């Protein structure tokens, strides 16, 4: 068990999938090599998986927890700076092979901080979807826009500069969410939706659920057109326009080249 009072962010299932692949390949390597293959193959697969988990998980978990703590520390800043820092960091966490939803849930990222988190996630998901449209067309638009921007990680490793348009976009939309529209995430699920962005529209549904809950409890008088305008602009319009504009600039100066954003 983890020590009391310590918040732990578990490694993403993406890391678990990578470990499973390595373990499976090791199992295949010894398959059909012995007369007791039915025992050796699963034994090697299990042992390799357990060994890699014991080796990698503590370090990855510690790094994810430290990253989450950094996000939590940013929530005490003034709304403008908090909007920038939280939006950028949660957006980065969403695209990295760690779970932004787990981080937001573990640290209870709700209220204005939750709204900034939604802005950062949308900046990465919608941003990458629009930024890479010329390479990936409609399939890429859907898979990244309502799926995950994590699909771009192999391309980011090859050319980290392709991430700059989405990061800059999140730095702009975050403070707009907190200071202009006062976008809050008060979903009863306690922060999970804050780290989901447009994935299945969970972030937007979470914001709406929070509005409904606030109206029911008397915290909010009513859901206004200004609320809807803010949600639509922060979630879809601004990420698409800003990331496309930033991307156009970086393409012109040669930092992003044709094919850099192609999904394999």
List the predicted regions and their residue ranges.
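Pore-lining transmembrane helices
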Residues: 1-264
């Amino acid at each position: 068990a983890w020590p009391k009072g310590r918040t732990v962010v578990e490694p993403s299932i993406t890391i678990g999938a990578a470990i499973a692949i390595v373990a499976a390949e090791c199992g295949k390597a010894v398959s059909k090599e012995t007369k007791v293959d039915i025992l050796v193959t699963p034994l090697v697969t299990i042992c390799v998986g357990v060994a890699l988990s014991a080796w990698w998980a503590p370090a990855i978990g510690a790094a994810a927890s430290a990253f989450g703590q950094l996000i939590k520390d940013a929530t005490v800043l003034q709304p403008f700076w908090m909007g920038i820092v939280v939006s950028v960091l949660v957006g980065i966490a969403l695209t990295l092979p760690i779970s932004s939803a787990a981080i937001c849930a573990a640290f209870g990222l709700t209220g204005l901080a939750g709204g900034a988190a939604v802005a950062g996630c949308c900046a990465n998901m919608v941003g990458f979807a629009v930024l890479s449209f010329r390479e990936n067309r409609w399939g890429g638009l859907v898979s990244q826009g309502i799926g995950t921007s994590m699909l771009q990680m192999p391309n980011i490793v090859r050319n980290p500069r392709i991430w700059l348009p989405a990061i800059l976009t999140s730095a702009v939309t975050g403070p707009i969410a907190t200071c202009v529209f006062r976008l809050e995430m008060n979903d009863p699920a306690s922060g999970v939706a804050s780290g989901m962005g447009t994935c299945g529209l969970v972030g937007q549904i979470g914001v709406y659920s929070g509005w409904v809950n606030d109206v029911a409890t008397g915290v909010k008088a009513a859901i206004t057109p200004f609320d809807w305008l803010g949600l639509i602009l922060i979630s879809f319009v601004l990420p698409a326009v800003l990331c496309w504009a930033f991307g156009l600039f970086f393409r012109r100066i040669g930092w992003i080249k044709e094919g850099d954003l192609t999904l394999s």
